[in-house]
Amino acid sequence: MGRMTTQHFADGEFAVSYEESIRGRDVFLVQSTFPSADNLMELLLMIDAAKRASAHYITAVVPYFGWARQDRKDKPRVSIGAKLIADLLSTAGITRLITMDLHADQIQGFFDVPVDHLYASSVFMDYIEKTMPLDNLVVATPDVGGTKRASSYARHLGVPMVICHKTRLRANEVAEMRIIGDVEGKDVLLVDDIVDTAGTITKSADLMLKNGAKSVRAMASHAVMSDPATERVNESGLSEMIFTDSNPYIKGSPKVKIISVANLIAESIKRVCSHESISSLYSF
């Protein structure tokens, strides 16, 4: 673990500095982009400082890649935020990116440096197989966009899959939702990549129970949990909400379970250093 300091100023600016020589060294900077603006700016400054200190390789390890939901121009006069963040990281000086469960796989193509895209599936699969009886399990996705993810889990577990089809009024507000498939008497596992305000995931859970599901759990890689997410989870029919620790979750809910991906990240860093394959680290 290297030594560095961050100095904060009265006007809100900050400066970073390395407290030891990193000349000719391979530097791995571990920083999720949440909270988004400050963490991203700090990461960019760390990258720039490492480059100016003559580091050999600079790898940004970003378990949660913010702005990933802005991956396309889906209406007039909007930015493609994910592409901009990729450009900023590359311009700052990274030589590689390690990230996990991108909202859209194609974001890897926004970078001109190698991207190692990890998946939390191996960590989640171990937890599922140890804690959830598979004979009555159904995997569900809270929206059509997550069908590929849910299908991979269902296929790997050998269980059926159902889909929640939703229409939105606007961002973070769901207008209508219906189930495609049968959940009567089943233990449902909802899988997603990001839970922000928890509107979609909790409405999906309540709809599953309304349609006869025996129980509903949810599993997502990244806990953004903007207000009123914790309240919604607590008041919903979810029996458990499972996240990784890609983001810090401090608000607290008795229903929330955090599973660490520290070993997954550490092993990926080790394999980058030893030039080994990373794809074998995850189940799918």
For each feature predicted by the language model, list its residue ranges.
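PRPP-associated nucleotide enzymes
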Residues: 1-284
